[in-house]
A protein has these predicted regions:
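Extended, charged catalytic domains and RNA/DNA-binding interfaces, predominantly
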Residues: 1-171
Length: 171
C-alpha cells in the first residue's frame, strides 16, 4: 500500500491475489490492511482477489468488494492445504455470479485478461460485472472491449498493473 500511495501516487488500489493461493489467514490480513490504509478523499483501498478459473469455466475475473468483511469464493483450493471451506468454492463463472448475488455482497467484477483470459461469451451478469480490463502488465487487449460491445453490453473500461511484483501502478 505504501508503494501505491507514496511512490506510484495512486488514488485507488486493490490487491488481486490468485484465489487458489489465498489462505483464510491471508484473506483476513488483507482485509485488515485495506481497512488500515483507507483514507476517504485521499487514498481509497478495496479488498479483493482474482477469481482464477480456467478459460473454459469463465476465465480470470477481478472481484472487488466495497468494504472489508466479505467471504472469498474461490474457483478451487488447488494450492491450499486447508480445504475445510471447499464447499463454498464457485467452480464456474456462473456459480460465482450466483454465490455473490445470493450473499448480497457489495461487489463488482471485471473481466480480466491474464494467464487465463476471461471468456465473456460464457455468461455475464450486468449488475455484477460492470467493466472489462483492456490493459495490464500482460499487454493491451482491446478485443475484449470490442467483443463486449458486439454482444450489446454496456461496460466500463479499466487498466491495472497486475505485475505480481508488489508495485501497483508501476506498469
Amino acid at each position: 500500500m505504501n508503494f501505491a500511495r507514496n511512490k506510484a501516487f495512486l488514488d485507488v488500489v486493490c490487491h488481486q491475489g490468485n484465489d487458489f493461493q489465498i489462505k483464510d489467514s491471508f484473506w483476513k490480513h488483507l482485509n485488515d490492511v485495506t481497512a488500515d490504509w483507507n483514507e476517504p478523499g485521499r487514498f481509497t483501498t478495496f479488498p479483493g482477489y482474482e477469481w482464477s478459473g480456467n478459460t473454459a469455466v469463465g476465465g480470470d475475473r477481478n472481484v472487488i468488494f466495497a468494504e472489508e468483511g466479505f467471504a472469498i469464493r474461490r474457483c478451487s483450493h488447488a494450492l491450499l492445504e486447508d480445504r475445510s471451506d471447499a464447499d463454498t468454492d464457485a467452480h464456474t463463472i456462473s456459480q460465482l455470479y450466483q454465490a455473490l448475488r445470493e450473499s448480497g455482497d457489495n461487489v463488482v467484477i471485471f473481466a480480466h485478461v491474464g494467464g487465463r483470459y476471461a471468456d465473456i461469451h460464457l455468461d455475464h451478469d450486468p449488475e455484477l460485472e460492470t467493466a472489462v480490463e483492456i490493459h495490464s502488465d500482460w499487454g493491451t487487449f482491446e478485443w475484449i472491449a470490442r467483443d463486449s460491445f458486439r454482444l450489446g453490453r454496456r461496460i466500463g473500461i479499466v487498466a491495472n498493473s497486475d505485475g505480481h511484483k508488489g508495485r501497483p501502478g508501476a506498469s
